[in-house]
Amino acid sequence: MVVAKKSLGQHFLTDESFLDRIVSALPPLNSLRLIEIGVGLGDLTLKLLDRYPLKTYEIDSSLCEKMRERLKKQKKPFELELAEKDALFLKEEEPYFLISNLPYYIATRLVLNAFKDPKCRGLLVMTQKEVALKFCTKDSQNALSVLAHAIGNVTLLFDVPPSAFSPSPKVFSSMFEVIKEPLKEKALASLIPTLSFEEALQKGFETLEDFLKACFSSPRKTLSNNLKKSVSYKEKLDKVLDFLALENQPTSVRASEIQDYLKLLKYLLKG
């Protein structure tokens, strides 16, 4: 019997109906490789293998061994590459699509890693509902939402109750999808025009991410007050105020009220 490890944030999805909904939610992959983070008990992995070749990253050696045992009992061959590695260091040479029931405690980091990886062309992932809502809200209420919509098209799909897992978490989970959008990627890469496209895209995303950390450092304070405290941007405060004037926005505007962060950041970086 496999016992979930709290240290790895393990909650195994066991409800067949939700497993099937996840597989059905996958968009056409075309020539993209399918990458899974976390093999768990292998239930989702086996359903995916019924349709696609698959590479799975799993840090827990006991779960890897359990998956190998399950595969031996299957009546048909499956095309699975089981990488016994930490997914925080996921690196692929070819374009791929990511799917996962992510561990709560590192879910945000893994999603952001996928956003900034040019080889990742999209993701279908489950996180704590609160985290999913932060990524999927359509306005600029938080930095995660701005980052998600800056890189692709974002869709909140469905909620998953605690009863669908073993052991049951204390909160609801949600499944959401992000499909990378080439025009949005081009806009991000244009922030750093001196590099190759993939390098510029990654660096552009990281530049926006760092800028947003400064902008949203104290969400209830004004944007200008937050940037005054930033080592990187406090010297650009006059340009921020110039931008707000050009956009007919008051100097008292908060970070959540900025409509176009890429436009603001480009303005600050030029000249």
Swiss-Prot record:
S-adenosyl-L-methionine binds at H11, L13, G38, E58, D86, N101. InterPro entries: KsgA/Erm, rRNA_Ade_diMease-like_C, rRNA_Ade_Mease_Trfase_CS, rRNA_Ade_methylase_Trfase_N, rRNA_adenine_dimethylase, SAM-dependent_MTases_sf. Its main location: cytoplasm. GO terms for molecular function: 16S rRNA (adenine(1518)-N(6)/adenine(1519)-N(6))-dimethyltransferase activity; RNA binding. Its EC number is 2.1.1.182. This is Ribosomal RNA small subunit methyltransferase A. Gene3D superfamilies: Ribosomal RNA adenine dimethylase-like, domain 2, Vaccinia Virus protein VP39. It catalyses: adenosine(1518)/adenosine(1519) in 16S rRNA + 4 S-adenosyl-L-methionine = N(6)-dimethyladenosine(1518)/N(6)-dimethyladenosine(1519) in 16S rRNA + 4 S-adenosyl-L-homocysteine + 4 H(+). The lineage of its organism: Bacteria, Pseudomonadati, Campylobacterota, Epsilonproteobacteria, Campylobacterales. It is an enzyme of class 2 (transferase). GO terms for cellular component: cytosol. The keyword Cytoplasm applies. Belongs to the class I-like SAM-binding methyltransferase superfamily. rRNA adenine N(6)-methyltransferase family. RsmA subfamily. Specifically dimethylates two adjacent adenosines (A1518 and A1519) in the loop of a conserved hairpin near the 3'-end of 16S rRNA in the 30S particle. May play a critical role in biogenesis of 30S subunits. Pfam families: RrnaAD. Keywords: Cytoplasm, Methyltransferase, RNA-binding, rRNA processing, S-adenosyl-L-methionine, Transferase. It comes from the Bacteria. It is found in: Cytoplasm.
